[in-house]
Curated annotation (Swiss-Prot):
Disulfide bonds: none annotated. InterPro entries: Ankyrin_rpt (IPR002110), Ankyrin_rpt-contain_sf (IPR036770), Asz1_SAM (IPR042650), SAM (IPR001660), SAM/pointed_sf (IPR013761). The lineage of its organism: Eukaryota, Metazoa, Chordata, Craniata, Vertebrata. It comes from Gorilla gorilla gorilla (Western lowland gorilla). This is Ankyrin repeat, SAM and basic leucine zipper domain-containing protein 1. GO terms for cellular component: pi-body. The gene is ASZ1.
C-alpha cells in the first residue's frame, strides 16, 4: 500500500499526476550498516536511505538519518516533504517524529496541504484521526482548500471518517463551505452514503438546504445514488439538533465529540439524532412544517389540534388555508368522537335506536381503522435495527406503551361483551313481554305484502295484454 501511495501524489478530484512514474521512492531490503552515519555517507546516499526508511516506516532509522544532517523539510519527487508522505500513509508515529523535529505542518504543494493529504489517506480511521490531531495541534489550517476548493472536512466526509469530521469542526473547520461544484461536506456524505457522517454534520450545524451548481440539495444527491435512508432523513425540514455543539468551547466540543463517539462505538448506536414527535410527523405529512414553532409556543399537542373548533383555529393564528388541510385530514382519519358524557341523563334515556345503532357502527369503524393502522406499522417496521433512519428512544418505553394498549384492548373487549349481553337481555325480555305493542313497521307488513301482490298481478295482466296484442297483429 505504501508503494501505491508513492506512485504519484494524490490530485484533488481523484486524478493522478501525469508526470513520470519514477517518483524517487523505492521499496526493497534496506541494508543498514552498523557504522555511524553522520559524516560517513554522501548526502545523496543519505537521502536514498531516508526515502527507503520512510517507505518501510522505520522510525528509528529516520531519526538516525535526521540526526546525521538530513533536513526534515527536504523535498523529493513532485516536491513532497517527508511529513506529507507520512500523512499520506497515515503513519501517526512518523508524523509525530517529523513534527517534533520541526517539520512544517502548513506546507502545501500545488494547493495540496498536508492536512488534506492526511484526511484523504488510505488507512484506519484511528490512525488518520491521530495524524489529523497532530497536524491541528501544530496550527494546520482546517479551512485551506485544494484546487477544486475542497477542504479537509469534505475529504473526511467523503471517506466516512466521523471522528475526523467532528475533530476538524472542533478546531474551526467551516461546515457549510462549498467546493467548485457546490458540494458541501454534507453533500459528499450523502453522495457516498455515509449515514453516520450525515447525522454528525446535522448535529454540528450543516445546512441541508444548500444546493450544488446544478441545483441539487443533499437529499436529492442521496436519492440519485440510491441511499434511501439518507434521503428520508434529509427530506425532513425539521432538524432539532442543528448546531447543538456550536455554542461550546473548543475544549468542551472535543471532549463531547470523543466521549460521545466512544460510547456509540461500544453501544452500537450510530447517532444521537432525536426522533420526531407525532405532531411534527403529522404536520410534515400535510406540508405544514411552518406551523410547528407556532403550535409548540402555544403548547398545542396533536390531540388538541385534532379536536379544535374553527374559532380555536383562528384564535391560535392558523390561517384558513391551513385549516382546510387539517380538516380534510381529520375527515379522512375519521377521528370524530361521540361524547355521551356531555349529554343530560334525560337525553341518555331518550336516545333513539337509530342514534344508538349509529354509535355502534362508528365505534366498529374506529376499531377497524385502528386495526389497519397497527397492521401497517407492523408491515413497515424494520426488522433490522440498522435500517432505522432516525434514532429511537429505549425499546423499553415502546414495550411498556404496548402493554398498556393490550390492557386497554382487553378492557374494551370486556365492556363490549357486557354491552352485547345487556342488549341480548333486553331483546329477550321484549319478546317475552305480553304487553309489548307491535311496532308500526311490523303492523304494516301485511299491507306491504298486499301491495306487492297487487303490483305483481297488474304486471302479469299487462304482460298478458301485450302477448294478445302481438298475436293479433301477426294474424
Amino acid at each position: 500500500m505504501a508503494a501505491s501511495a508513492l506512485r504519484g501524489p494524490p490530485v484533488a478530484g481523484g486524478g493522478e499526476s501525469s508526470e513520470s512514474e519514477d517518483d524517487g521512492w523505492e521499496i526493497g531490503y534496506l541494508d543498514r550498516t552498523s557504522q555511524k552515519l553522520k559524516g560517513l555517507l554522501p548526502i545523496e546516499e543519505k537521502k536514498e536511505k531516508f526515502k527507503k526508511a520512510m517507505t518501510i516506516g522505520d522510525v528509528s532509522l529516520v531519526q538516525e538519518l535526521l540526526d546525521s544532517g538530513i533536513s526534515v523539510d527536504s523535498t523529493f519527487q513532485y516536491g513532497w516533504t517527508p511529513l506529507m508522505y507520512a500523512a499520506s500513509v497515515a503513519n501517526a508515529e512518523l508524523v509525530r517524529v517529523l513534527l517534533d523535529r520541526g517539520a512544517n505542518a502548513s506546507f502545501e504543494k500545488d494547493k495540496q496541504s498536508i492536512l488534506i493529504t492526511a484526511c484523504s489517506a488510505h488507512g484506519s480511521e484511528e490512525q488518520i484521526l491521530k495524524c489529523v490531531e497532530l497536524l491541528l495541534s501544530r496550527n494546520a489550517d482546517p479551512n485551506v482548500a485544494c484546487r477544486r476548493l475542497m477542504t479537509p472536512i469534505m475529504y473526511a466526509a467523503r471517506d466516512g471518517h466521523t471522528q475526523v469530521v467532528a475533530l476538524l469542526v472542533a478546531h474551526g473547520a467551516e461546515v457549510n463551505t462549498q467546493d467548485e461544484n457546490g458540494y458541501t461536506a454534507l453533500t459528499w456524505a450523502a453522495r457516498q452514503g455515509h449515514k453516520n457522517i450525515v447525522l454528525k454534520l446535522l448535529e454540528l450545524g450543516a445546512n441541508k438546504m444548500l444546493q450544488t451548481k446544478d441545483g441539487k440539495m443533499p437529499s436529492e444527491i442521496a436519492k440519485r445514488n440510491k441511499h434511501h435512508e439518507i434521503f428520508n432523513l434529509l427530506s425532513f425540514t425539521l432538524n432539532p439538533l442543528e448546531g447543538r455543539l456550536q455554542q461550546l468551547t473548543k475544549e468542551d466540543t472535543i471532549c463531547k465529540i470523543l466521549t460521545t463517539d466512544s460510547d456509540r462505538e461500544k453501544d452500537h448506536i450510530f447517532s444521537s439524532y432525536t426522533a420526531f414527535g407525532d405532531l411534527e410527523v403529522f404536520l410534515h405529512g400535510l406540508g405544514l412544517e411552518h406551523m410547528t414553532d407556532l403550535l409548540k409556543e402555544r403548547d398545542i399537542t396533536l390531540r388538541h389540534l385534532l379536536t379544535m373548533r374553527e374559532d380555536e383555529f383562528t384564535k391560535n393564528g392558523i390561517t384558513s388555508k391551513d385549516q382546510q388541510k387539517i380538516l380534510a385530514a381529520l375527515k379522512e382519519l375519521q377521528v370524530e368522537e361521540i361524547q355521551f358524557g356531555e349529554l343530560s341523563e334525560e337525553t341518555k334515556l331518550e336516545i333513539s335506536g337509530d342514534e344508538f345503532l349509529n354509535f355502534l357502527l362508528k365505534l366498529n369503524k374506529q376499531c377497524g381503522h385502528l386495526i389497519t393502522a397497527v397492521q401497517n406499522v407492523i408491515t413497515e417496521l424494520p426488522v433490522n435495527s440498522q435500517k432505522i433512519t432516525l434514532e429511537w428512544a429505549s425499546p423499553q418505553n415502546f414495550t411498556s406503551v404496548c402493554e398498556e394498549l393490550v390492557n386497554n384492548v382487553e378492557d374494551l373487549s370486556e365492556k363490549v361483551c357486557k354491552l352485547k349481553d345487556l342488549i341480548q337481555k333486553l331483546q329477550n325480555e321484549r319478546e317475552n313481554d305480553p304487553t309489548h305493542i307491535q311496532l308500526r313497521e311490523e303492523v304494516s307488513t301485511w299491507n306491504s305484502r298486499i301491495l306487492k301482490r297487487t303490483a305483481i298481478t297488474i304486471c302479469g295482466f299487462g304482460f298478458l295484454l301485450f302477448i294478445c296484442k302481438l298475436t293479433f297483429q301477426r294474424k
